[in-house]
Structures are given as C-alpha cells and as structure tokens.
A protein has these predicted regions:
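Short, glycine-/aromatic-enriched active-site segment of Class I SAM-dependent methyltransferases
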Residues: 221-238
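Short alpha-helix
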Residues: 238-265
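Rossmann-like AdoMet
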Residues: 2-110, 114-155, 171
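Conserved beta-strand signature within the Rossmann-like core of class I S-adenosyl-L-methionine
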Residues: 198-215
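Short amphipathic alpha-helix with an adjacent loop that forms part of the alpha/beta core around
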Residues: 162-172
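Core SAM-dependent methyltransferase catalytic element
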Residues: 266, 275-298
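A short SAM/SAH-binding and catalytic strip from SAM-dependent methyltransferases
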Residues: 174-189
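A short, conserved alpha-helix within the catalytic core of class I
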Residues: 185-201
Length: 298
C-alpha cells in the first residue's frame, strides 16, 4: 500500500532501516530529485508530479542524515546541467515506450533498474502491462509511494538473477525492456549474459538501454569519471562505471539475430535548456560518451 498520513509517522521512524541501500541503488535518488527539480522549473522538460510528492516526503527523512549525497539532494545542490540531462533522458525513454505502445497497446514493458521513477504513471494507456524491476531495498522504498494493480507490478530482484524473467514470460507479449542508467554499473559478462538470455526467452522483443563509451573506462579518463561520480556527486565507492561499448552496433556481434534499430544522444535533442553544450554535438566522441541504443532481439 502506498504511503498514507496514518502510516507516515511509522515510516519515518523506520526510515534509517529502509534507506540502508547500496551505492548503486542510491543513484536512483539522484534521478528522482532531478525529475522533481525539473518538474518545478519554468517550462519543464519533464512533468513528474509524483517525483515532487516523493521528494517532499523524503526530505523530511534525509534532512536528518549525515550522508553528503542526501544533504546535497535535500538542499537542491545538483548541477543544472545534470538535472537537464536526466530530464531529457527520461522524456526520451518515455517516448520510446509510447512509440512501442502505439504499435502494441497491450504490450508488456519491463523497466529494468526502475529506481523510484514513476514511468508507469506517465505512459499508462489503460492497457499496458508494466513491470518495475529493481533491487529489493529499492522496491521496499518504492512500495511506500506506489501501489501495484492488475497491470502494474513490482519485481524485487537483481536483474542478474534471471529467475525474474519467469514472471514476465507468463504474458504473450510483445515485450519491451528498457534500462535507463543501469548497464554501465555492471560487468560486460553480466550485460552480455542478460541480453542473450532476453533474446532466448523473449524472441522478437525490443531492448532500449543506455550505454557508455568504453574509451572512458581506460586511464586517465576512468579516473576523471570516478572523480565526477564520487567527489562531485558524492556517490559511494561502488557506484562506478564498468561496462561500455565503442559503437552503437557493437551488440550485434554478440549473437545472430540481435538487430540494431537506432540510437539516441542528448545532443540529438533540440531542447533549449542544453544551452551552449549543444555545439559539441557534432564531435562523435562527445556525442557518444553516454548514449542510448535500441535493438530488436530476434
């Protein structure tokens, strides 16, 4: 059951237990707060009132924490550029889902590494079957703010424990798997195993996932990225990027039948809030530092 006034006090009293989450899981708070901040800005890129509601409640809990990341979130100390990028990304992933549902209104969507995102509320067409998948500690928090129904379900599991697929496989499909800001924290062997299993278990499904340029995983660029994640964003030591690719079509080489459909970068957006940084979009290395690929898993 979602959080109500009657159980809010109890939830706050137990908050220290509920908020003991891994470094990688804590990144979901950054995404959530970016959504909330942008939603309250002038001419917002993303309209996410649920994020505003959740952060208003979390502020009452996180304000008592000595965690530097949590203090930054409560005090709104997130860089404007980060907020803009996260909001543009969420809007684009919503568009991917809406495009899928336009062709398959009763399709099945699995939001891998969902965090506290309210994508289901933003894209619900009244027919979609939607699964939010994330680590148990994240889903436990999410249950305080969202309610499941006959078309909206939680899966409390690591994406690497492939047993979660049996629940999704109960449906006929078609299937769309989205992984926004997830794969870069995993190892290549795990990402490859996951995608090959999705291809085997859900033939004909689509995958939309964010990827990172593997060149940035080599020194000295790797140290620069880790500095940004841990010293500037104050994420934990385990929240580091491990997986990357060089080319949008690279996953096609993993197995016959993996078909590249398209890709997307922040620089493809005509959003005015990107500002001067848009001038670097013509540089391929910059455009594809962190971007999104779309595949058909035949």
């Amino acid at each position: 059951m979602a959080l109500s006034k009657n159980n809010l006090k109890e939830y706050r009293e137990n908050a220290k237990l509920n908020l003991k989450i891994s470094d990688v899981a804590a990144t979901s708070f950054v995404t959530l707060y970016c959504h909330a901040i942008e939603s309250q800005s002038n001419d917002p890129i993303l309209n996410d009132p649920k994020a505003v509601e959740i952060t208003n409640e979390l502020n009452k809990i996180l304000s008592n924490s000595e965690n530097k990341l949590y203090q930054d979130l409560v005090n709104g100390k997130l860089k404007k550029e980060l907020v803009t990028h996260i909001a543009i990304r969420a809007r684009q992933y919503d568009r991917y889902v809406n495009d899928f549902l336009r062709d398959s209104p009763e399709g099945v969507v699995v939001n891998i590494g969902c965090g506290l995102d309210s994508r289901f509320l933003r894209i619900d067409n009244g027919k979609v079957i939607f699964y939010d998948l994330d680590l148990p500690e994240v889903i436990e928090i999410k249950k305080q703010f969202f309610e499941e129904n006959d078309r909206y379900h939680f899966i409390s599991s690591s994406v690497l424990d492939h047993e979660w697929m049996s629940m999704v496989a109960e449906h006929e499909g078609p299937f769309l798997f989205v992984a926004e800001g997830v794969f870069m924290y995993l190892n290549q062997e795990d990402v490859q195993s996951l995608i090959l299993t999705l291809q085997s278990e859900f033939p004909g499904s689509e995958l939309v996932c964010e990827v990172f340029n593997s060149l940035w995983l080599k020194e000295p660029l790797r140290s620069i990225m880790n500095f940004k994640l841990q010293r500037q964003l104050h994420l934990g030591k385990d929240a580091i990027f491990n997986f990357g690719i060089r080319d949008s079509k690279e996953m096609e080489t993993w197995n016959t039948g993996i078909e590249f459909l398209d890709d997307w970068s922040y620089f493809d957006s005509d959003e005015e809030k990107l500002g001067w940084i848009k001038i670097f979009g013509w540089i391929e290395f910059i455009r594809k530092t962190q971007w999104t690929v779309h595949y058909k898993l035949n």
